[in-house]
Amino acid sequence: MPHITVLGAGSWGTAISKHLVDNDQKVTIWDRNKKLLQEIKEGRNSRYLPTLKLPSNDINVEGDINESLTNAQIVILAVPVQHISEVLSKIHKSSLTNKEVIFVNLSKGIEINNRKIPSKIFEEYLSGFNYCTLSGPSHAEEVAENVPTSVVIGGIDDQVNKYIQEIFSSETFRVYTNNDLIGVEISGAIKNIYAIGAGIIDGFGKWDNTKAALITRSLVEIIRYGTYYGGKKETFMGLAGIGDLVVTCTSSHSRNRYVGEMLSKGMSLKTILEQMVMVAEGVYTAKAVYNDAKEKEIEMPIASKIYQVLYEGVDPKTAIYELMTRDLKSEFFN
């Protein structure tokens, strides 16, 4: 049985820790919030998963990141993308030298300043270590409650992928493998932008036609952006792509969808973010992708309009009107 360390005691870190313990794995969870760790030790996480009953004393807690990495064989990165560099820097400076350790990333997003997905940030600090990403339609709240869920482990090493697949899989958590790491991470990052758009639509009422069009045309943009960077088209048609896009655009658990809904009801972005407990990665990813797509000349009209609503004060209904009245064209083109 491998020793597993989870870095980050947010909703995902807590949910995956519970899942792994339920799956008879040995887990230590680290976070810099000592109060949160004490709660987890007592069997709860009132900040991120307040209704969840945790297996008290079965999850080891550790407030020192160096201690948490001692004897670790699998390290799970469960921190927001905008903070992942800080955590990776701590690991780089730690005593961890065993290159057999496998890192499993759970974060979905693109770093706002350097426009990098998690695997590219990881390479800057821990090149040479094993790395893969777990992604797909998997809200932490449902995983923690053992709701049947299917996900993808994406990584360049098939043997590592298969090993992690076996460790994580259970009767309620089915893991597929995919060697398209780039495609898996880009899918998980960019769908958050479009979830904001879906929330905007929800705020206006039951606009089912509009939401169906948004999801479908958003997938086209994800494929354009992802294949530009070498992702495989079939990845975007699978769990990491369309699967995650659908659940994020439709679920009441979606933080990014919530942001869009509040925007369409007239609340400012600043106020929305101040009131949220958890991070809405799509807000930051929208800026990174907008600037990158503009620079690379990748056509992403929906993502561009969502960026304008977030950062340029464009009225959501105006953004929809401008999308609907663009030049007419064929549905499919190269």
From Swiss-Prot:
Q: Please state the protein's primary subcellular location.
A: cytoplasm
Q: Which residues cross the membrane?
A: none
What processes in GO biological process is this protein linked to?
carbohydrate metabolic process; glycerol-3-phosphate biosynthetic process; glycerol-3-phosphate catabolic process; glycerophospholipid metabolic process; phospholipid biosynthetic process
Molecular functions (GO terms): glycerol-3-phosphate dehydrogenase [NAD(P)+] activity; NAD binding
Key word Nucleotide-binding present? yes
Per UniProt, where does NADPH bind? S11, W12, R32, K108, A140, R255, V279, E281
What catalytic activity is recorded? sn-glycerol 3-phosphate + NAD(+) = dihydroxyacetone phosphate + NADH + H(+); sn-glycerol 3-phosphate + NADP(+) = dihydroxyacetone phosphate + NADPH + H(+)
Where in or outside the cell it occurs: the entry states:
Cytoplasm
Q: Where does sn-glycerol 3-phosphate bind?
A: K108, G136, S138, K191, D244, S254, R255, N256
Q: Which UniProt keywords apply?
A: Cytoplasm, Lipid biosynthesis, Lipid metabolism, NAD, NADP, Nucleotide-binding, Oxidoreductase, Phospholipid biosynthesis, Phospholipid metabolism
Mention any Pfam family matching this sequence.
NAD_Gly3P_dh_N
Pathway the protein acts in: Membrane lipid metabolism; glycerophospholipid metabolism
Fetch the Gene3D superfamilies from UniProt.
N-(1-d-carboxylethyl)-l-norvaline Dehydrogenase, domain 2, NAD(P)-binding Rossmann-like Domain
EC number(s) recorded for this UniProt protein: 1.1.1.94
Identify the SUPFAM superfamilies for this entry: 6-phosphogluconate dehydrogenase C-terminal domain-like, NAD(P)-binding Rossmann-fold domains
Gene Ontology annotations for the cellular component aspect, listed alphabetically = cytosol
InterPro entries, A to Z: 6-PGluconate_DH-like_C_sf (IPR008927), 6PGD_dom2 (IPR013328), G3P_DH_NAD-dep (IPR006168), G3P_DH_NAD-dep_C (IPR006109), G3P_DH_NAD-dep_N (IPR011128), NAD(P)-bd_dom_sf (IPR036291)
Where along the chain is the active site annotated? K191
Q: Which family does the entry's similarity section mention?
A: Belongs to the NAD-dependent glycerol-3-phosphate dehydrogenase family.
Q: What does this protein do?
A: Catalyzes the reduction of the glycolytic intermediate dihydroxyacetone phosphate (DHAP) to sn-glycerol 3-phosphate (G3P), the key precursor for phospholipid synthesis.
Name of this chain's protein? Glycerol-3-phosphate dehydrogenase [NAD(P)+]
